[in-house]
Swiss-Prot record:
Serine protease inhibitor that inhibits trypsin (Ki=0.0035 nM). The keyword Oxidoreductase does not apply. It comes from Naja naja. This is Kunitz-type serine protease inhibitor. Disulfide bonds join 5-55, 14-38, 30-51. InterPro entries: Kunitz_BPTI (IPR002223), Kunitz_BPTI_sf (IPR036880), Prtase_inh_Kunz-CS (IPR020901), TFPI/VKTCI-like (IPR050098).
Length: 57
């Protein structure tokens, strides 16, 4: 799995409320979070399937 999958969920600095998914390294699964729309990090996916393919395997 790519190293960025280990990063925490990062909402970013903007104030949008966009549903997104991130890989939770503690639970070893992808989870939903609210993305602010800018900034953040690479551990952010538009769909849970994309997250699972990239970080779960």
């Amino acid at each position: 799995r790519p190293g960025f999958c280990e990063l925490p969920a990062a909402k970013g600095l903007c104030k949008a409320h966009k549903p997104a998914f991130y890989y939770n390294k503690d639970s070893h699964r992808c989870q939903k979070f609210i993305y602010g729309g800018c900034g953040g990090n690479a551990n952010r996916f538009r769909t849970i399937d994309e997250c699972n393919r990239t970080c779960v395997g």
